[in-house]
Every structure is written in structure tokens, then in C-alpha cells.
Amino acid sequence: MNRKDKYYIRAKRENYRSRASYKIIEINNKYNIVSRGDNVLEFGSSPGGWTQVIENITQSVIIAVDINRMDPVKNTVFIKMNIFDDDIFKSIDHAMAENNIKNFDSILSDAMSRTSGIEDRDHYNSYKICERVMDISIPRLKNGGNIILKQFQGDMTNEFIKKWSGYFNYYKITKPKASRQHSREIYIIFLNRI
């Protein structure tokens, strides 16, 4: 982590766990993905930068999933699990039942595998994560709900969008200012589940 990075410095000053907090702040300010009272499912939650922002907005239950541990965040049920684990469906459904959640208003994914520096491999891995997130999410997202996913842009991005955009009224691609400029990282936003 570059300790001279302005978002890193700002995150430390404002008590956010990561510079990624500013990505979700910017995206939500622009697209109004989450609102007060929303129930949210979050993938790739550790260390909790997005979770802090989401909880501050929704002041409602968040179910957060990550393969890495995460320190507690208010109103958050944390599931430490790999999203490719067969039990992920059961674990999420159990957490939903325990918290009287029928469907989610919004589902957010900042999940990413470790990068290799090989662009095609990193893109493919991010594509597979996004596919898995969508497989988990579509049956659990309410009509009118929204999804955000991080992906390394590449030759399968258009195919991914074409496959899933039919479930929504519209989609957007964005790259927040807090994303590193040289990164191929983008956020795909699917809005208003049909």
C-alpha cells in the first residue's frame, strides 16, 4: 500500500478500513445503489471498507462474505467462506432466514482473486468470480434491486454484460476516481431488476 496515496491517507484520517470506501461512496452518490433500510449482500467484504459505508447509509442488516477474516462491523453478519464453496448457498440462505430477509435490495461485489500480473488470467479469474456472484445473486435479489460487480475489463466483459443485462432495466460501466488509473478494474452496475 502506498502510504502517500491520497485515498489511503484520507481513509486513515476518516477511520475507514480501506481506500476502497471512496469507490462505493462515489458509485452510490452517482447511481443511488443502496438507501436507508435496504438489506444488502456484499461479496469480497474484507477488510470492511465498503461494509462501513454501506452500514452508515442503510443502518440495516448486511450479510457480508469473504474468504478472509473481517473485524466486526455494526449490523453485519459475516460469513467467512469461499464463494465457490458448495455450501455458500446454504450459508447465505441461513443468514437470510436468521435475519428475516426474504430478498436483498442490493448486492455488491468487490471480490477479486489475487492478481498475477498476467492480464488475460486476471481478467478470466475476475470474470469467473462475477459469474458466480450472479448465480448466487439473481434468485436472492428483489424486483427493482441493483447489483454492482468489480471486474478486470477484458474480452469476456461484453459477453458477461450481454448474458446478465436482460435481468435488469439497464446497466452502466464505471471506474471511480479512487480506482488506480493504470488498473483495468471497472465496476459493472446492473440497475432495477425486472
Swiss-Prot record:
Its EC number is 2.1.1.166. S-adenosyl-L-methionine binds at G48, W50, D66, N82, D110. The keyword NAD does not apply. The keyword Cell wall biogenesis/degradation does not apply. It catalyses: uridine(2552) in 23S rRNA + S-adenosyl-L-methionine = 2'-O-methyluridine(2552) in 23S rRNA + S-adenosyl-L-homocysteine + H(+). InterPro entries: RNA_methyltr_RlmE (IPR050082), RNA_MeTrfase_FtsJ_dom (IPR002877), rRNA-MeTfrase_E (IPR015507), SAM-dependent_MTases_sf (IPR029063). It is an enzyme of class 2 (transferase). Keywords: Cytoplasm, Methyltransferase, rRNA processing, S-adenosyl-L-methionine, Transferase. GO terms for cellular component: cytoplasm. GO terms for molecular function: rRNA (uridine-2'-O-)-methyltransferase activity. Pfam families: FtsJ (PF01728). The active site is at K150 (proton acceptor). It is found in: Cytoplasm. Specifically methylates the uridine in position 2552 of 23S rRNA at the 2'-O position of the ribose in the fully assembled 50S ribosomal subunit. Belongs to the class I-like SAM-binding methyltransferase superfamily. RNA methyltransferase RlmE family. This is Ribosomal RNA large subunit methyltransferase E. It comes from Picrophilus torridus (strain ATCC 700027 / DSM 9790 / JCM 10055 / NBRC 100828 / KAW 2/3).
